Amino acid sequence: MGIISYLFDLAQDMALAAIPAVGFAMVFNVPQRALRWCALLGAIGHGSRMVMMSAGFNIEWATFLAALLVGSIGIQWSRWYLAHPKIFTVAAVIPMFPGISAYTAMISAVKISHFGYSEEMMIMLLSNFLKASSIVGALSIGLSIPGLWLYRKRPRV
């Protein structure tokens, strides 16, 4: 029963991650023929992050590795479909952005400014701010590294 419920949760997570990936791809004017690939790549990225987190990785490292995967697949698909990799990758990583951590940090900052300094609120603010910043950094670095590796002009040695 455990593996079936895990696979169901994984499929649900991937399906729900594909929806905002397509939505943001439409906002970014991605061609209609590429929308399904943006959805698939968003689902792959979010699903791989969920698998890594359930395997014991923390969310920052899981996000970094998932962004590496999304960037690598996006570069390969861009070669196949003769499109820029950002068409596939940028909309695909948006479902992995840390909305809850950033929101909690913002609310903590507002509460500190409204009610005054509180050690609990400051700890909540700093921990959530650092978590959100780390995840955004992991997304941006993980998305850019495959391009640096695969489009390198000079020899590595």
UniProtKB/Swiss-Prot annotation:
Main location: membrane
Entry membrane topology: Multi-pass membrane protein
One Pfam family hit: ThrE_2
One BP term from GO: succinate transport
Cysteines joined through disulfide linkages: none
Transmembrane segments: 10-30, 55-75, 87-107, 129-149
Record GO cellular component, one term: plasma membrane
Keywords attached to this entry: Cell inner membrane, Cell membrane, Membrane, Transmembrane, Transmembrane helix, Transport
Subcellular location: Cell inner membrane
Domain of life: Bacteria
Family (UniProt): Belongs to the ThrE exporter (TC 2.A.79) family.
Further comment: YjjPB constitutes a split-type ThrE family transporter.
Job description of the protein: Involved in succinate export with YjjP. Both proteins are required for export. Participates in succinate export, but also in the export of other dicarboxylates, such as fumarate and malate. Contributes to succinate production under both aerobic and anaerobic conditions, and increases fumarate and malate production during anaerobic succinate production.
Matches recorded under PANTHER family: SUCCINATE TRANSPORTER SUBUNIT YJJB-RELATED (PTHR34390:SF1), UPF0442 PROTEIN YJJB-RELATED (PTHR34390)
Quaternary state and interactors: The transporter is composed of YjjB and YjjP.
Protein name according to UniProt: Probable succinate transporter subunit YjjB
Species of the source: Klebsiella aerogenes (strain ATCC 13048 / DSM 30053 / CCUG 1429 / JCM 1235 / KCTC 2190 / NBRC 13534 / NCIMB 10102 / NCTC 10006 / CDC 819-56) (Enterobacter aerogenes)
The organism's taxonomic lineage, starting at the top: Bacteria, Pseudomonadati, Pseudomonadota, Gammaproteobacteria, Enterobacterales
